[in-house]
Amino acid sequence: HVRVNADNPEDAALALEFGAEAIGLCRTEHMFLGDRKNIIQSFILSDDEAVKQQALADLLKVQTEDFLAMFKTMSGRDVVVRLLDPPLHEFLDDPRELEVAITKKEAAGASEEELAALRPRLRRIDSMVESNPMLGLRGVRLSVVFSDLPLMQVRAVATAAARLIKEGVDPRPEIMVPLVSITAEHVQTREVIERVI
């Protein structure tokens, strides 16, 4: 059996053309890059609950659209959806680059109002820096700390699948929880998933 890595419907369609039978890994973190990076940053960095909830709503919308397209392309075939896996810093601005940008703005005479938006952001990102991010806040641990993220992702998977079933499509999603090390991580994430499904 040939399963492929595919993170968008175009890759899934190409895989089918080459004879793939299923998607063995859909890396959802790739769906949060580009212009969507700002949305997940708003969720992670904000202390304002309303901003966090709006970011989650925006993420739910784009994730649902992504999964609708993926599952439709792969109708009748398995799609293994991995919940967010990479270290937290991959979703954030590089703190040293942000520090340089602030210094340049200060030197150029930027207004205090403009700088006031950047300084707290830098402090927040600096507070999240890890000495070894590959072993730190990533995979299931990211899901434990930010439990709304896997909840949103599972809701997007379930919503897309339910909608397509009503349209006569045969979605077959499977959910992978990354980097589980201890039973408690599995139990907590499973409880989150079961609240949706």
Regions found by a protein language model. Give the residues of each.
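Conserved alpha/beta-domain cores
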Residues: 1-197
